[in-house]
Amino acid sequence: MRNLDAMGYNAVSTDPLYKHIPFTITQRSDISYGLFYDNLSSCWLDLGNEIDNYHTAYRRWQAEAGDIDYYLFTGKQVLDVTKAFVRLTGKTLFGPKWSLGYSGSTMHYTDAPDAQNQLMNFIRLCEQHAIPCDSFQLSSGYTSINGKRYVFNWNYDKVPQPKVMSQSFHDAGLKLAANIKPCLLQDHPRYGEVAERGLFIRDSQTDAPERSSFWDDEGSHLDFTNPQTVAWWQEGVTTQLLEMGIDSTWNDNNEYEVWDGEAAATALAAKSPSNIFAR
């Protein structure tokens, strides 16, 4: 159970998923129970699939680091168990009503050289074909420079008037959600500034920003255990998105696929920073 960007996941032949929560539920005829393993490191769960001549089917949990800390929830029904679980962890917030409607999305529009025209044409096509639509997911092409993605960077050649474009969507009754990524490529226009301020996860050997493979290059992931990083991120969302008329964010590629198991963060109490930040 390690958070990986598992694009193309196959339920039959592959293990990794995008996100993992080490919580299992068992249902019996007269009782249901759940086990939540409170450990942020990479872990393994064997739910009775191994065969041992000397033992009946058993379950096994193994963690790369940390304590054996778990919670047991019981109830007559699975619903009782899940209610107890979310009382401990907190619930998912209800999204706005518009988030339940049809939402358009494609990388084609924002990757096109005339992205703004393509996006405006989407509005016209919805009207032409009487397609009800409540929102559009703005893929990361709007941030690109030479094909690579740079969070909080508008490509004004593709989208020369972000505010005008946003207003056109609003006039048509559509909300906009913009793609953002919590990792800066090594040649991001603001990489040096962010590195100098110590806002990245740090390499365990050099104390320099840790670099991992990310979107056709190498990049450094932001350390959100640092309050200054949170403030920098909030400033970027506000000035580059909300003030441009964007209604919501699409937090993408946030698996934190960091393979340096000893990488350091401001408030890191366990191994596997990838799991800590992704969860």
What are these regions (language model features)?
Residues 112-129, 229-239:
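Short, acidic/polar
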Residues 7-15, 73, 110-114, 154-157, ...:
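Conserved aromatic-histidine-acidic binding/catalytic patches
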Residues 1-99, 105-108, 115-117, 123-128:
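Catalytic and substrate-binding clefts that recognize carbohydrates or anionic sugar/phosphate headgroups
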Residues 132-279:
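Aromatic- and carboxylate-enriched substrate-binding clefts and catalytic-loop regions
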Residues 102-117, 219-232:
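Active-site mouth loops of central-metabolism enzymes
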Residues 96-103, 138-139, 253:
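Short coil/turn segments at secondary-structure boundaries
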